[in-house]
Amino acid sequence: MIITSSAFGAELVVMSSVGARSVMDELGPQFERASGVVLSFRYDTAAALQRAMEDGARFDVAVLTSPVMSVLTAANKIAGADQSTFASALIAVAVKHGAAKPDISTREMFVQTLLSADKISYAKEGASGQHFQRVLKQLNLDEALRDKLLPMTGAKEIEAVADGLATLGVQLTSEILPVKGVDLVGPFPGDLQNRTELKIAVSTESKSTDLARRFIAYATSSAAAEVIRAKGMIPP
């Protein structure tokens, strides 16, 4: 990648779902060194970022779940022609580091594991948490587990497991792996799984569209795919 005088020192604001943070923490500095562009990241749940964008927050690039991206495209916040699939991730379970890993390979064992847990933390607004709540209703466990559930905000649901506040944590694989003090048990089994797709796109109000497109090209390159895999996500 060639550094140009117009790019050097320019800034791009990237609003990204926390599910992609571990990937962006590596790709971002690589792109900055190669391009001379300064990246400013804002991480939150896709739902929280959607509200911020609808309220007028300025950004150049967005990394969001597909449903949220569709809503923002319809609202003319995201350029429909400048979108690419970034990565996808599976919803998984975590336990405190060193704790016995339960068998969740089948629906039956998954249910038994949930019923045996003292506390289960999950993201109140995140895509993984929303799917988990749907799964509980599907399994008719929402009432049985009501007193065991710890809905959390601020991406603290896996830290709660590390701190001993929860026995199990539910989150995307890519959000479990970077957290110290926890171990990945594995993904939700079979038809209880939901593959969360993230897309990357340019803001309709970006003043640096060309640079934004360059970053998207970098983030969806074959070299980026290696980083995506290493961080527990699935490249397109």
What are these regions (language model features)?
Residues 1-5:
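Bacterial N-terminal signal peptides
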Residues 8-55, 63-75, 80-89, 95-236:
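Exported/periplasmic ABC-transporter solute-binding proteins
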Residues 59:
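Dinucleotide-binding Rossmann-like beta1-alpha1 core, especially the glycine-rich loop
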